[in-house]
Swiss-Prot record:
PANTHER family: SSRA-BINDING PROTEIN, TMRNA-BINDING COMPONENT OF TRANS-TRANSLATION TAGGING COMPLEX. GO terms for molecular function: RNA binding. Required for rescue of stalled ribosomes mediated by trans-translation. Binds to transfer-messenger RNA (tmRNA), required for stable association of tmRNA with ribosomes. tmRNA and SmpB together mimic tRNA shape, replacing the anticodon stem-loop with SmpB. tmRNA is encoded by the ssrA gene; the 2 termini fold to resemble tRNA(Ala) and it encodes a 'tag peptide', a short internal open reading frame. During trans-translation Ala-aminoacylated tmRNA acts like a tRNA, entering the A-site of stalled ribosomes, displacing the stalled mRNA. GO terms for cellular component: cytosol. InterPro entries: SmpB, SsrA-bd_prot, SsrA-bd_prot_CS. This is SsrA-binding protein. It is found in: Cytoplasm. Belongs to the SmpB family. The gene is smpB.
Amino acid sequence: MAKKDKHDDALARNRRASFNYFIGETYEAGIQLTGTEIKSVRLGQITIGDAYITVRDQQAFLNNANISPYKQGNQFNVDPLRRRKLLLHKKEILALDRAVSKEGKTIVPLRVYIVKGFAKILIAIGTGKKNYDKRQTIKERDLKRELGKNLKNFH
């Protein structure tokens, strides 16, 4: 049996990331969550569309990721948009910090998934696309779709 890719069972995806950024090197990081937050994440109640990562004092943080409050959490629920620490090796954090210090580079979250009971996030160093780059991406996507339709109709 073929080995299953661990990124296939993503609980949340940032589908706009590849449209808005040229994706470079990727890293897998753990997310420091409270008990009710991990329960919400396992239920798929997380949104990373507007999220971004910052590096400060040799620590990486996930900002603006929305984890909905757990229904049975009551007083243990925390702010859904709070800043969450990312668990990375020191060398990885320094590499991210060096990359972001260059003009036009940012760290974008790509997807959230569970590995052996722990919440993980796939992050990447991205370079922002200009509007003409985005239009080129749309043209390529439409051309690929049209080619697929033509091949389907040909058979």
